[in-house]
Each structure stands twice: as structure tokens, then as C-alpha cells.
């Protein structure tokens, strides 16, 4: 009995020691932070960045107040990641805020250092002086231009297909350059070497590491026997990732028969060199064991064979070609990528801010079947198109309360109907609708461009093929096949639409064009009728300042309607007619109607067959230094836009 008692006592001591050891393990990593920083401060928001570490964390985030030493009892934002990048939104203008990060366990609460910042005053409605004009225009050819602004040098960049790129400090004078590629052994690697060996070879899902060594070049070679990488580096999108402290280029490595991938390349400087990190998404695994070369099993789990839904001869009707990325942060600080071309629809994935790659911890439950896919476990959520209807070059930008989605329909050649369409949503991942409330996501196949378009003319027709307009877009230089655009709500208080255009009589030659964009009274985007040449009108001024005096409006105008269903094969263009805006508010001439100004604003309505709600501003009629009142407007019931400009010397 004594021996049993002694044995029980020893066991009890052992249990106590074990329990104590377990307790020590629980608290051995203290709660801690890297230094909290605040950046991107503007009128109503700011971005807080910090890293929270420690064991058994229950909550982490930032708290803020207009008084010093904020606590978790004040306004707070929670984070599910240790590397926190949180956007403080809804702030008052010209107000000082105090911010602290916090991390909490079951037994402890720790705060970071305190940072204070003052939001900017409300957006300026004062025009910037126009210090330059049409003489500053220096053209550049960049196909599929994606625009990005480098705050450190106050320089705009456009990156495009086939390694074309250019930079400008005024969006008018462009200088071309080529960003070099890097590998482990070279800072100026060849195209054939740059995409074979990723720097990142492991990714994490659910806390577990998985090997991922993807040769992007070898994958795209599967589509053809005579593959040439030099013509297949398509449509990059470049963004600054503050968590990674890197410039991130998302580049399409295109291959025939959908053997394509979007890869991440990073650089310390925006002009490179860029080094291949890892794939973000891959397409084309529809036969055999090809999927074993991709990250499909990391996303879905181990598969005995390729899932039946991917074994299809209708890949282009159901799934995307993994090209044409658009990467952006939403207003809550999440990182997203929309992508896809040309016929399977536009899809969207959430990315990991720490790696810039796919967020493998976000799952996508299958929705839909057959060709009617709405959500795919691998490709993500479909937000537009599908069923072999055309659509590519998605671009999403948050402007004035909405996420705007641009998609380009049609074929990219000069006479194949390339044309931008616009949708919007309150959420980054949709649903996206046009001004008629028609969805960007299609329920079946439609012809969605050209004279036989039968989709109800989905998507605002922000501009299309046009000619005999002003002094530049005339005759053989008339614009057509405009598309694969990007758009930027720029730090100068203006929004710019950037696209490439072909021309009526110049073959397949193309150039970049930039137009300022405004929101009309209904919040839809309308593009200025002429190329940007340094006009200083701020977006915030449109709703509160009348830029063109009522007395300056009457006179003779050229009026151009951007029509749907142009016959591009027949080289059809939209061309202007002559009308007169009379002082009594009537319109006479080739079309008749009325016009009116909303008092105290630049909002103008022109009623013809429909009512076009838009804005009236002064523009320069490039290439001359001739200024004129110009109108741009949208009839939201049809999606049709119109432009008008007043004749000189009226």
C-alpha cells in the first residue's frame, strides 16, 4: 500500500510538472509589435501598418481616437493577420487622430507606440494653373497600358505588353523605357531565362507549407511546338505593396490553347529589375496529369485525378485564360486580382498581402455547373462575361463611392470592334451592373459588339470609334479600337482614363491616349471629349462650382454620339453633327431639344431623343492652344454617351 501511495504521489508530481511545462509553453512567446506607422493620409482615410506577434492571440488590430492614448474601448479595426495593413476610413477632414495597435490574449493586452496624424483639408475645388498645353504632347506606343503613380518621384508609369513601358511627370510627355528582368545570377536576364525558376518555392495554406516550383515558360510551351516567349509577355499590372516593401508586377505569360499563367515579379525600384517570384493563377489543365505541375492540389487538396469539370473541350466557354491581371487594394485594405480573357469570363481572387500571391486560406465554394460557372474552387468568383462572349482587360478602380469595372469587348485589331464598357458596384467583388442595371455577369452567350450585338448593349459605352473630331482625330488619324485601358484616381485630385487606340488609316499602329474623367450627377463616369493637355479642373469641383458660365454656353457646337453597334468591318465611325445651343435653353440644328445647367455646379443636362446628364468644362482643342466649352454626358437608360464642343470664335 505504501508503494502504491508513493507511486501515486510521483505520478501527481509528474502531472504537475507537465502541467507547469505546458503553461510555460503557452506564454513563452510574449505579445509584441514592430513599430506602428501611418501612411497614405488623405482627407477621410489613412493606412496603419504594424506586425503583431505572440502566442495564443485572440484579437489584434488598431484603435484610434481624436484624444491621446486610444484604447480598445475607442474605435477599433480588427485584423486576422499578424502583418496588419488596415485602412482607417470615414475620418473627418483636417482633424488630428491618435492611433495605437493592440494585441490581446486570454490573459494580456498590449499596446504599441502611439502615432498621431492630421487628415488633409477637404478636396480642393480650385483649378490648378494650366502651365503646359498641347505642345507638351509626346506620343508613345504601349499596348494594353496599365497606369501607376510613383509617389517618391511624382512620376506616372504605363506598363504594357511585350515589355513596352513609358513614364511621364505630366501624362503628356512620355518617354519609353524597358524594365529589365532579374534571376539569381543576373540583373539583366533574357526572356527565356526569366520565367523558369521562381524565387519562392513554398507557399502556405492553413499553416502548412507546400512545395510549388512552377516553370512558367515550360507550361506555356505546352500549347504549341513553335512557341516564342518574346510575343507572349502580355498586359502586366504594377502596384506598390507596402507590406512587402516591393513593387509587384503581375505579368501574363500567355500560351496557346489556354496554357497560360499570371506570375508575380518583384523589384525594389519601379523601373526594375523584376524577378520572378511564383505563379498566382494558372489555366489550361484540362487533360491527363498536367494539373500536377500547377498549384491545383494546394488549392483543392490532393486529387486522385483531374476533377471532371475541368476535362472539357469548352474551356474557353467556361473558364478563363489566365491573363490580363488587375491588382488593387479595396477600401478595407484587402488585396484583390481580377483577370481573364477572352471568352470564359472575368474572375476574381483575393491575394495575400504578405506574399502578393494567391491567398490560399480563402476558399471558393462551387456555384453553378457546366458552362454556367459563377464561382469555381480554383479560379475564384466570376464577375463578368462568360459563355464565349467576348471580354478581357478588366480594370477596377474605386472612384467617388463605387468600384468601377472596365471590360473591353470585341477583337483588338483596328476593324474588329474593340471597345471599352463600364460597370460599377458597391463591393470590390461585385455584383457589377451598368447604368441600365444590367449585370456584367452573363446568363448565356450573347454577341456583345458590332452591328449584330444582342446583349441589350450591356456596359456604358464610355467612348467608341470616332472621327472628324476637333483638329487631331480626323481622316486617317480618327480613333478606333480603343481599349485595354486602365484608370487612376490620381493624387492631384483628378481621374484619368488611359488606353491604347488604333486609327482609321494607320494599319495596326497604336498609341496611348489619356482623357480626364468625371462623375456625372448620377455618379456615372463620363470622359472628357478631348485628350488631356494639362487642364487643371479638379474632380471635387464639378458638383460645387460652375466652370463654364451660363453666358458662355450658347453657340454652335459639334455634337458626337457614341453609338453601339458600329459596323467595324466596314470601318464605320461615329461622326459629329452641328447643333446650336440657344440662349433660351433650346437646341436647334441637326438635332433638337433643350439644355439646362444645375445652379452652382458644372452639371449640365442636354435633352435630345434622350436626356444626357453630364458636365461642361473648358478644354484645349489639341494640337492648337484653342479653348472651348466642352460637354460630356450619359443617358443612363441606354448607356449611350455624347460629346460636344463649341466652335471657335462663336
Write out the residue ranges for each language-model feature:
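Processing junctions and N-termini across compartments
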Residues: 13-14, 162
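Sec-dependent signal peptide recognition
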Residues: 3-10
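Carbohydrate-active catalytic/glycan-binding domains of CAZyme proteins
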Residues: 120-650
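Short, surface-exposed linear motifs at loops/turns and structural transition points
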Residues: 21-122
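Intrinsic low-complexity, intrinsically disordered segments enriched in polar/basic residues
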Residues: 2, 95-96, 524
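C-terminal motif of bacterial Sec signal peptides marking the signal peptidase cleavage site
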Residues: 16-19
Amino acid at each position: 500500500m505504501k508503494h502504491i501511495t508513493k507511486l501515486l504521489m510521483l505520478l501527481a508530481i509528474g502531472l504537475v510538472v507537465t502541467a507547469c511545462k505546458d503553461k510555460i509553453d503557452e506564454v513563452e512567446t510574449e505579445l509584441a509589435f514592430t513599430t506602428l506607422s501611418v501612411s497614405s493620409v488623405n482627407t477621410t482615410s489613412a493606412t496603419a501598418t504594424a506586425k503583431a506577434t505572440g502566442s495564443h492571440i485572440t484579437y489584434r488590430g488598431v484603435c484610434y481616437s481624436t484624444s491621446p492614448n486610444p484604447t480598445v474601448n475607442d474605435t477599433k479595426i480588427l485584423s486576422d493577420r499578424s502583418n496588419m495593413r488596415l485602412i482607417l476610413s470615414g475620418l473627418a477632414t483636417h482633424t488630428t487622430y491618435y492611433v495605437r495597435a493592440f494585441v490581446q490574449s486570454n490573459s494580456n493586452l498590449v499596446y504599441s507606440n502611439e502615432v498621431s496624424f492630421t487628415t488633409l483639408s477637404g478636396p480642393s475645388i480650385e483649378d490648378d494653373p494650366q502651365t503646359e498645353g498641347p505642345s507638351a504632347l509626346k506620343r508613345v506606343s504601349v499596348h494594353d497600358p496599365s497606369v501607376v503613380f510613383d509617389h517618391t518621384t511624382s512620376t506616372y508609369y504605363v506598363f504594357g505588353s511585350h515589355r513596352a513601358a513609358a513614364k511621364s511627370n505630366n501624362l503628356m510627355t512620355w518617354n519609353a523605357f524597358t524594365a529589365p528582368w532579374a534571376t539569381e545570377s543576373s540583373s539583366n536576364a533574357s526572356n527565356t531565362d526569366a520565367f523558369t525558376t521562381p524565387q519562392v518555392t513554398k507557399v502556405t495554406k492553413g499553416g502548412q507549407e507546400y512545395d510549388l516550383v512552377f516553370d512558367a515558360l515550360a507550361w506555356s510551351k505546352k500549347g504549341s511546338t513553335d512557341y516564342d516567349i518574346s510575343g507572349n509577355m502580355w498586359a502586366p499590372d504594377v502596384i506598390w505593396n507596402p507590406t512587402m516593401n516591393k513593387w509587384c508586377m503581375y505579368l501574363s505569360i500567355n500560351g496557346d490553347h489556354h496554357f497560360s499563367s499570371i506570375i508575380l515579379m518583384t523589384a525594389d525600384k519601379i523601373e526594375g529589375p523584376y524577378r520572378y517570384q511564383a505563379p498566382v493563377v494558372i489555366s489550361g489543365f484540362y487533360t491527363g496529369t498536367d494539373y500536377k505541375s500547377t498549384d491545383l492540389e494546394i488549392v483543392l487538396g490532393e486529387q486522385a485525378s483531374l476533377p471532371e469539370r475541368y476535362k472539357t473541350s469548352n474551356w474557353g466557354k467556361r473558364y478563363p485564360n489566365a491573363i490580363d491581371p488587375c491588382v488593387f487594394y479595396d477600401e478595407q485594405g484587402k488585396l484583390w486580382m481580377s483577370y481573364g480573357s477572352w471568352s470564359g469570363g472575368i474572375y476574381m481572387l483575393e491575394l495575400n498581402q504578405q506574399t502578393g500571391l494567391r491567398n490560399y486560406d480563402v476558399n471558393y465554394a462551387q456555384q453553378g455547373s457546366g458552362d454556367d460557372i459563377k464561382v469555381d474552387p480554383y479560379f475564384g468568383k466570376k464577375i463578368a462575361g462568360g459563355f464565349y462572349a467576348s471580354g478581357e482587360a478588366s480594370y477596377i478602380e474605386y472612384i467617388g463611392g463605387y468600384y468601377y469595372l472596365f471590360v473591353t469587348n470585341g477583337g483588338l485589331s483596328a476593324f474588329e470592334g474593340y471597345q471599352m464598357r463600364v460597370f460599377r458596384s458597391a463591393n470590390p467583388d461585385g455584383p457589377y451592373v451598368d447604368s441600365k442595371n444590367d449585370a456584367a455577369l452573363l446568363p448565356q452567350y450573347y454577341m456583345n459588339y458590332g452591328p449584330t450585338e444582342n446583349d441589350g448593349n450591356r456596359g456604358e459605352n464610355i467612348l467608341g470609334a470616332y472621327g472628324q473630331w476637333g483638329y487631331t482625330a480626323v481622316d486617317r488619324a480618327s480613333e478606333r479600337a480603343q481599349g485595354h485601358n486602365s484608370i487612376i484616381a490620381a493624387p492631384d485630385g483628378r481621374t484619368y482614363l488611359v488606353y491604347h487606340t488604333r486609327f482609321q488609316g494607320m494599319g495596326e499602329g497604336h498609341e496611348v491616349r489619356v482623357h480626364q474623367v468625371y462623375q456625372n450627377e448620377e455618379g456615372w463616369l463620363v470622359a472628357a471629349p478631348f485628350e488631356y493637355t494639362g487642364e487643371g479642373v479638379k474632380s471635387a469641383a464639378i458638383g460645387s462650382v460652375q466652370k463654364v458660365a451660363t453666358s458662355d454656353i450658347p453657340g454652335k457646337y459639334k455634337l458626337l454620339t457614341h453609338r453601339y453597334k458600329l459596323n467595324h468591318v466596314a470601318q464605320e465611325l461615329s461622326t459629329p453633327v452641328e447643333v446650336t445651343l440657344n440662349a433660351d435653353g433650346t437646341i436647334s440644328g441637326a438635332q433638337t431639344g433643350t439644355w439646362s445647367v444645375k445652379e452652382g455646379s458644372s452639371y449640365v443636362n442636354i435633352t435630345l431623343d434622350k436626356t444626357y446628364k453630364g458636365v461642361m468644362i473648358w478644354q484645349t482643342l489639341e494640337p492648337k492652344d484653342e479653348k472651348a466649352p466642352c460637354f460630356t454626358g450619359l443617358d443612363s437608360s441606354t448607356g449611350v454617351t455624347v460629346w460636344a464642343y463649341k466652335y471657335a470664335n462663336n
